[in-house]
Structures are given as C-alpha cells and as structure tokens.
C-alpha cells in the first residue's frame, strides 16, 4: 500500500467502525495515518478506485518501478515487501541480508509492511533472513499489531510461532487484541489471539479500555471473549 494513497470516497456506514466519541483515534491516525482515511475505515474494504487502479498494474509496470529504485536497495526492499514481490525480496536479501530490518521514516520495517498487507510468503522469507519480529515503529507498533489490525490471521499466527509478543503494547497501550477487537471483520484473528495461552485480555489501553470493551462497542464478535472468561492465571510469557 502506497503511503500517499488517499481515499476521497465518503465512508460506507455499513463498513466503518462505530467508535465512541472518546475513542483514541488520534493514535491510530498518527500511527497508520498513511493507511487509514478519516473515520478509520480500512483502505482494503470495498472497491475503491485505488484498488481498481492497483489491480490494473502490469508486470512491466512493477519492473519499471523496481528499476527506478535499484540504486536504493533499502527503499526497494520496503516497497517489494509491501507489494508482495517475493522474487525481488529474495534477490535483495541474497545480495545484502543486512537490509532485512531497514526502516522507513516512520520506522516501519519490510516485515511491518508485509504483515499489514497479509503477504505470508514474504513474511516467511523476511523472518528466515533474520527480520526482527519485535521491531517497533515510532508509535510502538510491532509487525503483529499491523497483522492483527487488518485481520491477517495467517500472518499473525506465523509471527506468534516465531516469538512475537502477543501482549505487546504501543505508546497508547494498545495490544494486538485491542486492534483486532476494533475491526468488525476480525473473527479469525480474535479467535487466534484469544486461544493463545499467553494472552492477557485484561490489559487496558491509555483510555482504560480492555479489548472486550472495544469489541462490545464496535463489533459482533464480542462473544468470543467467553474463551478467556475467568482466565486470571494465564501462563506468563518467558
């Protein structure tokens, strides 16, 4: 997803989230401002003109973009991870594996970009070359936060298998579970997180809200929290 992407369409009431007036949208906008248009509606939901335009991109177009960035392999790796250009990612890492944890101006790594776009094969390749699953952005988001925000459950599962912290908190004290709870389409991710033996569902964000508080207000899957109801002695994560 390109950082300069802007959604000029009006939010769809059926797809947008019903946050309370006190919900901390500021952190989400500051953290993923290049991904979230006004109203916190995901750019991946619906058939926007941007989606159609990206679908029309040809292989020749992608190759041209790569050629333009060849002299800046770090920039190219970030772009390739975001665009699911697995072969390009493999080539760049074989040439210089130290670029695997390169960062953009917001401290997003290639792993963050692949995670929030759901590119599992790219995620696998990056981690195989030493990508840091604990890397944080300027606002404290880990790759797991990025995957869970957009309901990329398969990516989230893979990150957890490679020691990602299921209870990691951003600067606003948001956990991956908080972010999944705020997404109406996050059933798979919620189930994945809630069934994790190390989950701490009682953690609160900077507004003193638990993930269940957010799920009850914004989604239809708050009943899933019954999985951890009464769980006061979850195993500590070493």
UniProtKB/Swiss-Prot annotation:
Pfam families hit by this protein: Ank (PF00023), Ank_2 (PF12796)
Database matches in SMART domains: ANK (SM00248)
GO annotation, cellular component aspect: nucleus
UniProt keyword list: ANK repeat, Differentiation, Nucleus, Phosphoprotein, Repeat, Spermatogenesis
Gene3D superfamilies xrefs: Ankyrin repeat-containing domain (1.25.40.20)
InterPro entries: Ankyrin_rpt, Ankyrin_rpt-contain_sf, Multifunctional_regulatory
ANK repeats: 77-105, 106-135, 139-168, 172-205
Domain of life: Eukaryota
Subcellular location: Nucleus
Main subcellular localisation: nucleus
Xref: PROSITE patterns: ANK_REP_REGION (PS50297), ANK_REPEAT (PS50088)
GO biological process: cell differentiation; positive regulation of DNA-templated transcription; spermatogenesis
Keyword Repeat assigned: yes
Chain positions found as Phosphoserine: 48
PANTHER family hit by this protein: ANKYRIN REPEAT AND SOCS BOX-CONTAINING 15B (PTHR24189:SF73), MYOTROPHIN (PTHR24189)
Protein purpose: May have a role in spermatogenesis where it promotes autophagy in response to serum starvation, via the NF-kappaB pathway.
Name of this protein: Ankyrin repeat domain-containing protein 49
